[in-house]
Curated annotation (Swiss-Prot):
Keywords, in A-Z order: Chromosome, DNA-binding, Glycoprotein, Isopeptide bond, Nucleosome core, Nucleus, Ubl conjugation
GO CC field: nucleosome; nucleus
UniProt entry tagged with the keyword Iron: no
UniProt family annotation: Belongs to the histone H2B family.
UniProt-listed CDD domains: HFD_H2B
Protein name in UniProt: Histone H2B
Cysteines joined through disulfide linkages: none
Glycosylation-annotated residues: 112
Species assigned in the record: Acropora formosa
Cross-link Glycyl lysine isopeptide (Lys-Gly) (interchain with G-Cter in ubiquitin): where in chain: 120
Post-translational modification remark: Monoubiquitination of Lys-120 gives a specific tag for epigenetic transcriptional activation and is also prerequisite for histone H3 'Lys-4' and 'Lys-79' methylation.
Single Gene Ontology MF annotation: DNA binding
Length: 125
């Protein structure tokens, strides 16, 4: 026969399993994280002008600018891969998209910096 279990009276300590979820409810839930290029923009700023700061409003504008350029390059390179009936966007499509999107000297510098970055990445593997 099973032993009898009596209910705890008011004021008595309860012995047994702790309530599940108490540790989870004690922790505060974080909101969804916002992805941003802010830390990278700041690192580049410090490389170029170590003594210069940036306001949060200016950082927001720079972040929007980077997102916009990134999207334009992605759309243009996607369009180029469709024209060439290719399923994959390669560095060639990215390079051509940059040449089409950016004017003159800026495009040349962007292509050379991009090539340098890709070479550095592939050699480090």
């Amino acid at each position: 026969m099973a032993p009898k279990v009596r209910a705890a009276k008011k004021g008595e300590k309860r012995v047994g399993k702790a309530k599940s979820g108490t540790a989870e409810t004690a922790k505060r839930r974080r909101g969804k994280r916002k992805e941003s290029y802010a830390i990278y923009i700041y690192k580049v700023l410090k490389q170029v002008h170590p003594d210069t700061g940036i306001s949060s409003k200016a950082m927001g504008i720079m972040n929007s600018f980077v997102n916009d350029i990134f999207e334009r390059i992605a759309v243009e390179s996607s369009r180029l891969s469709l024209y060439n009936k290719k399923a994959t966007i390669s560095s060639r499509e990215i390079q051509t998209a940059i040449r089409l999107l950016l004017p003159g000297e800026l495009a040349k510098h962007a292509v050379s910096e991009g090539t340098k970055a890709v070479t550095k990445y592939t050699s480090s593997k």
